[in-house]
Amino acid sequence: MESWSERTKQLLGSENMEKLARSRVAVFGVGGVGGYVVEALARCGVGFLDLTDADVVAPSNINRQILATVSTIGRPKVEAARDRVRDINPDCRVKIHKIFYLPETADHFDFREYDYVVDAIDTVSGKLMLAEQAKAAGTPIISSMGAGNKLDPTAFRVADIYETKVCPLAKVMRRELRRRGIEALKVVYSEEEPLKRGRTPGSVSFVPSVAGLIVAGEVVKDLLGREATRLSSELSLCRMESNI
């Protein structure tokens, strides 16, 4: 019987799988985008996950959040995420923080402990502080921009924050990061014009999920090195062709 990670190993190779197993990734926010980041990282074999979110699962989350089901309503999202990761990859060590990342809670975290930081939170102040703290620690970070009020999952792009366009959240982030002297920030953003502007953004299942999977893909490729993942994939394809 194949191991659960065998198909991934065929693409990435044993050495890269071992590197992922040693990697520690912090995910801030495990909702619509962040939940899918956690899902994909766990299924790729990342060995250490630090998950931060103070929210509990609500019925309104079910339309788009992978952790939200009828059976998880009322549960802290990070607890639901931890249990799901353990069901996927029992070897993954998961640490949870049932708090929001805010100025008053920032001292709970030492960013030097992480190999990568994922920002999937909603507040501009939190996103800015995450960028500042990760940059100060020299830890790679990727930030998710707005995924609400959108219907086109093919409109997502990966870019530096200063190369973004259309996204209202990215516009605010550009201005505030420039004020803080932060010269670069890798982001996933959408070039789709928001469909509506309201107090509560509309959402659909197939948009934040795609954003989260793109974020996770960038994390894995950066952890392993772009060239390493390309060469491993090419080698795997050659082996498959030789067996035909």
Regions found by a protein language model. Give the residues of each.
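N-terminal charged helix/coil linker that caps or initiates catalytic domains
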Residues: 1-25
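Glycine-rich phosphate/adenylate-binding loop
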Residues: 21, 109-116, 121-129, 136, ...
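Conserved N-terminal Rossmann-fold NAD(P)-binding element of oxidoreductases
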Residues: 27-29, 52
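Hydrophobic/small residue at the entry helix of a nucleotide-binding pocket
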Residues: 33-34
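Conserved S-adenosyl-L-methionine
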Residues: 43-48, 136
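Glycine-rich phosphate-binding loop and adjoining beta1-alpha1-beta2 segment
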Residues: 46, 51-89
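Conserved SAM/SAH-binding loop
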Residues: 98-106
